[in-house]
Amino acid sequence: MEGHVLAKKEPPMIRFQTARPVGLMTAAIAVVLVACGLQAADRPEITFSDARIFPESLTSTKNGDLFFGSLGLDAVYRATSKSAQATPWISAKSNGLTTVLGVFADEKAGVLWVCSSASGGRRGAPYVGETALKAFKLSDASLKGSYPFPGNGLCNDIAVAKDGTVYATDTNMGRVLRLKKGASALDVWAEDAMVLATADGIALLADGQVYVNSVGQGTLMRIPVKADGSAGPIVKLETSRPMMGPDGMRSVGNKTLLVVEGGRLDEVTINGDKAEVKVLKEGMTGITAVTLTGGMAYVAEARLNLRNDTTKDPGPFRAMGIPYKAK
């Protein structure tokens, strides 16, 4: 689960005596300001310091920091828990970053996983560059490792299991790749050119199984993890309502996912081979990702339809906060 609920606290009452030294009074005032600042953690909106960001993915840490993958600038932006504006955290096109999509904060490993992809590869066109899953230290944004996708492809989204295994979707090749804890290279864990075509969002629930959606097919699937770690038969889940272009997806409970699709934020509850879809908010434009932190589900507006049209101003980008309590 990425998010957790923070309880609001009233700022402490500070009493001053006229005989108290000025230094102590200043320190006491600082305590009040810090306490008040922490109460602003439920930021209703996050903006960006730069234009043409096109934030395709986002993730968060327990302290409320938000990280965004910038598809427009091939960079990673961060908004700290005390800020309502995201600024560059990993510089544009540094460390071989290209076509930045998925990001995932793995606090247990102290790593921010980032999807970086080669261009081309569609309709038989050759790939240019290298598709890789990159690991950056959460402590200082330095590059810790880079793991190429065999045969390139399009690294789209990332999830991490309790045992440290990292899974990443490949949208172009219809597969899920795996990086075992301590491994030096990715391996192809699950592959099906038809069923996993346009594989996009990925998450794990308490059952330890891998859940993947397809942005092009509007489907949600479960891939069992066998005792030896290999992938079991892919199961297409029956959703209670159609899903239109499902994209970013995060686990927020034992059987619950948050999913963005068709301009909506959904709460999806898994029961066997069925998925109950509850719309939490609709009418949003160009949303592609969601994360939960501090009792707020943040949804990123990517507006990807304007990315390749330089004649149109996409306007300022933002991530909207929607109050949500994890189950």
Question: Model regions: which residues?
Answer:
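Blade-level signature of beta-propeller repeat domains, shared across WD40, Kelch, NHL, RCC1
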Residues: G295-K327
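Short, solvent-exposed loop/turn segments at conserved positions within beta-propeller repeat blades
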Residues: G72, R122-E130, T171-N172, V215-Q217, ...
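A short beta-strand motif characteristic of beta-propeller blades
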Residues: R43-F48, Q85-K93, S142-P148, A185-D192, ...
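Asp-box/WD-like beta-propeller blade repeats and closely related beta-sheet repeat scaffolds
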Residues: Y127-A161
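Short loop/turn segments immediately following the C-termini of beta-strands
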Residues: L71, S117-S119, T171-N172, V215, ...
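Short loop/turn segments that connect beta-strands within beta-propeller blades
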Residues: T80-A84, K137-A141, K180-S184, P224-G229, ...
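Structural signal for beta-propeller blades
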Residues: D74-Y77, G121-R122, L133, G174-L177, ...
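Beta-rich, blade/repeat-based domains predominating
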Residues: S49-D65, L71, S94-G120, F149-V166, ...
